[in-house]
Amino acid sequence: MPLLRAEWWEAHQPLVVFMWIILLVVPFAIVYGAGDTFETVLECIVNDYLTFIVLLFGLFCVSGNITVGGDFAGSPRVNACLLALGTLLSSCIGTTGASMLMVRPVIKMNSWRKRKRHIMVFFIFLISNMGGCLTPIGDPPLLMGFMRGVPFFWSMHLLPILIFNLVILLFVFYHLDKKAYRKDIAQGRKPDISRPGTEFYIEGLHNIIFLIMIVGAVILSGVLPGMSAFQDAAGNVRGIRLYGEVTLTLPALIEIVIILLAAFLSFKTTDSSIRTKNHFTWGAIKEVAVLFIGIFITMQPALMLLKSVGPNLGISEPYQMFWATGALSSFLDNTPTYLVFLTTAGTLGLTGGITTALGQIPVNLLEAISCGAVFMGANTYIGNAPNFMVKAISDENGVNMPSFFGYILWSLAFLVPVFILDMLVFFL
């Protein structure tokens, strides 16, 4: 709908999302009963959506209070360096954090250009997705793996695969951008640089403290549940029971409070002129909040089906895990998809590899599942949370981004061939 009638969608977005939720909830309630349906929806909102949107909100606020300026213009060389930097940064502060921190500077440096949609598409490929594969901080699926016994630094095993993909995609990007850059120059477009040179400055740099607070909150959410102080006598994580078995856990509550505090302090300590320079508005986060609550709720039946049949799918080889996890992560939330196939791998009864709470998982299977979940979230706008956020901010700032299906064509053209190479080189 937002692709067919954008103005109508903006005016009626909450109503449309609510309609789709009702279309799912009513049949679900008829089959399973109102009580179970309410519990399922509430559990989805409390345990998945709430921490998800609070994290996005916090990163959106803090990154919006940091602005980068100077004499750098969006040339192919500068853009390639920015993408490489952002890709590596994603594993340090998360794909969402890196995306929100880098998206406005990249857009600003390329504001003089006409042909720039490819820049933001590759931004999503690399910074919003692939770059998050090296640590549990990078992407939520890896954080879930860490919470279930995968060592914190194990995901550094994925560095050769990341470098392999990064080199290929940056090579392709550089030549695409070089061609577009020459066309822009030929049409008389020039970067808006007042003085030649390499002057560079960052305003609102103190917000890095609040960014670190948010990253720390995410790490705590993975560490605290394993501590005895946060467990009851039965070994369950302590929390506030809301309805039935639905509980807002204390670690999740602590994470939410820290993130909201970081966002509040960021706004209180940063001059509003910085947000003005960033063309900061609430439009992008509002759209993501409304759209993703619909996605989270309406994907529950598919995830329930996947959980019930996952161990019986006959998937046991690394290349099968890579494609199965990746294909479903493209359209469902990659975190539960990762957990389903991680559980499947743990039930195969294989020996050797990593000892987790789900069983022994061979390294090659764990690599395939991790790469499938993290890398293939880039296949669609809804595959990973930062994707749609980057699209929304880009649209707000005058970048003509591809439509939903148009973006899929980009991923089919540039990502799928890389994934085929990944399979041939690493997973066969």
Regions found by a protein language model. Give the residues of each.
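Transmembrane alpha-helix boundary signature
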Residues: 3-7, 25-48, 57-74, 88-101, ...
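Alpha-helical transmembrane segments
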Residues: 43-55, 154-172, 241-260, 323-329, ...
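Interfacial loop-to-helix junctions that mark the boundaries of transmembrane helices
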Residues: 8-17, 38-50, 152-161, 197-202, ...
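Membrane-interfacial helix-loop connectors
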Residues: 27-29, 90, 101-114, 119-121, ...
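Hydrophobic core segments of alpha-helical transmembrane domains in multi-pass membrane transport
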Residues: 1, 20-31, 56-64, 163-175, ...
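Transmembrane helical segments that form the transport core of multi-pass membrane transport proteins
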Residues: 213-348
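Core mid-bundle transmembrane helix pairs that form the ion/substrate translocation pathway
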Residues: 155-269, 425
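Juxtamembrane and boundary regions of transmembrane helices in multi-pass small-molecule transporters
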Residues: 115, 134-135, 153-202, 375-428
